[in-house]
Curated annotation (Swiss-Prot):
Ranges of biased composition (kind: Polar residues): 229-243
Protein name (database record): Cytoskeleton protein RodZ
Name of the encoding gene: rodZ
HTH cro/C1-type domain ranges (all copies): 19-79
Comment text on domains: The helix-turn-helix (HTH) motif in the cytoplasmic domain of the N-terminus is involved in the formation of spirals to maintain the rigid rod shape. As this protein is anchored in the cytoplasmic membrane, the HTH motif may contribute to protein-protein interactions to form the RodZ helix, which is localized beneath the cytoplasmic membrane. The C-terminal domain may be critical for determination of the rod shape by probably interacting with enzymes required for synthesis of the peptidoglycan layer, including PBPs in the periplasm.
Residue spans of biased composition, Low complexity class: 193-221
DNA-binding region: 30-49
NCBIfam families: PRK10856.1
Biological process (GO), any one: regulation of cell shape
Length: 368
């Protein structure tokens, strides 16, 4: 009877009861145990009442009991078997792992999408390159056609790069035209000026003995080597002219003066000098509708005015200056827009958009 009573007493003593008895024997309160174990008072109370928290894992619950047993000096081997009988270990719920084949399907689909994306990118790049190449070939063919046309026109015109019509013969004025020369001396006299000298020689002997000086001629003026002898009935001697001619021959050998700078013999001082090539250039450049082009490199050019007449068609060398005048507006076709600068009536013409696009320039200048 005593053995059965002791077994019943052992079974009724749960881990919570034994822990409470040990705590009370040491004179500790639940608050003191909670502070030493760094737990809540409610957790200590649940352990002594053998209440397992539903949201607390069994592993943590066993750990709390072990710490409590060490604090009140109880052996763990006596409490753990009782605890296993009272609250068996619950199996942890583990979520089933996804199949490896599912991950492979995702990777396969992602790889297919990436391949399709790269294919689209390559197609777009290929189309862009083909479009650029076609435009480039078209521009090169157009430039080659223009050059062939220009070469054909040059061969037809005998090597002259500027074919002009009769109405526009003064459109291009030569800037470096030399003065006519005879026997090493400039010949500024025309038929009109020669007759003027002849008539003046009959009226005054001072005209043949001295040359009038203007502001544009230095004091050592040139005198022609040959003496002009007027064909008149005058009996005035010409020895004075011969003497003056001999005196000035030494100065005439070392100086060269253009016809526009030396006044005509026998002409009045208030008569204006004869026009030169420079005056023609300035007049055409400053006229209304003037078109001036400065070339920095070789360039093919074609200029057509409003009447449909071709003012210029050909290749200009670098460093050349082209002055054109016709009826505005002008239609220009330029093979290399970056090789020249254009000004119309003194205002520059913008060619930047053609230079950036690197293509043949077709524009109209002088549109009001």
């Amino acid at each position: 009877m005593n053995t059965e009573a002791s077994q019943d007493q052992t079974v009724t003593e749960t881990p919570g009861v034994r822990l409470r008895q040990a705590r009370e024997s040491l004179g500790l309160t639940q608050q003191t145990v909670a502070e030493r174990l760094c737990l809540k008072v409610s957790t200590i109370r649940d352990i002594e009442e053998d209440n397992a928290q539903a949201n607390l894992a069994s592993t943590f619950h066993r750990g709390y009991i072990r710490s409590y047993a060490k604090l009140v000096h109880l052996p763990e081997d006596e409490l753990l078997p009782i605890l296993e009988k009272q609250a068996p270990v619950r199996a942890a719920k583990v979520a089933p792992m996804q199949s490896f084949s599912l991950g492979k399907k995702h990777k396969k689909r992602d790889g297919w999408l990436m391949s399709f994306t790269w294919l689209i990118v390559l197609v777009v790049l290929g189309l862009t390159g083909a479009w650029w190449w076609q435009n480039h070939q078209a521009q090169q063919a157009e430039i080659a056609n223009m050059v062939d046309q220009s070469s054909a026109q040059l061969s037809q015109n005998g090597g002259q790069p500027v074919p002009l019509t009769d109405d526009n013969s003064d459109a291009i004025a030569p800037t470096d035209a030399p003065a006519p020369v005879a026997n090493g001396q400039p010949v500024p006299l025309t038929n009109h000026s020669t007759s003027a000298v002849t008539n003046s020689a009959t009226t005054s002997s001072a005209t043949t003995s001295s040359v009038p000086t203007t502001s544009s001629v230095p004091k050592t003026t040139l005198v022609p080597k040959t003496t002009l002898v007027p064909k008149t009935n005058s009996t005035e001697p010409v020895d004075t002219a011969n003497t003056n001619t001999t005196m000035h021959q030494e100065g005439a050998a070392s100086a060269a003066v253009s016809p526009s700078q030396v006044p005509q013999l026998g002409m009045p001082t208030d008569q204006p000098p004869l026009p030169t090539a420079d005056a023609g250039v300035s007049g055409s450049a400053s006229s209304v509708g003037a078109l001036v082009m400065n070339f920095t490199a070789d360039c093919w050019l074609q200029v057509v005015d409003a009447t449909g007449k071709t003012l210029f068609s050909g290749i200009q060398k670098g460093g050349a200056v082209l002055n054109l005048a016709g009826k505005a507006p002008y239609k220009l076709t330029i093979g290399a827009p970056g090789a020249l600068t254009i000004s119309y009536q003194g205002n520059p013409v913008d060619l930047s958009k053609f230079i950036k696009a690197n293509r043949v320039a077709r524009l109209t200048v002088g549109v009001e």
